[in-house]
Amino acid sequence: MKQSISLQIIFLFFVFQFSFINAQNKFDTPYGNNDSVGKYVEINGVKIYFEDYGKGEPLLLIHGCGADIKSMANQIDYFKNKFRVIVADSRGQGKSELKTDSLTYNQITNDWEGLVNYLKLDSINILGWSDGGIIGLKMGIRKRTKIKK
């Protein structure tokens, strides 16, 4: 009984925190749903949705598991004045298709490398959150793309 009540309190705390954070993050730009800069591209047999903001050195923003472009809104808003920010919904998340029974880091890494190739980017900077950090590390280890930072 005590454990059940504790779990309920923890759950309510996280729901409250999430609601509070979302209430604070209101932007003029509808990140993750911006028809003026968003588009779909077919990569590795799936439609991947991405948005492209700003000018300058390319910066890939890669969200974590269960998230989407909207979860990177603060970062997009900050970096778009200094970099060309490219942000996508990873396979099976947000507006991007899944088209598989299982999902692996290798598959997601292949998709991000495919997006870099599609955009014909010579060198990139990467900022990844959680699983996005793992994808960025895998891209660096593979050395198929020139990564600055």
Regions found by a protein language model. Name each.
Residues 2-59, 82-83:
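Alpha/beta-hydrolase fold catalytic core
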Residues 122-149:
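Conserved hydrolase catalytic core segment
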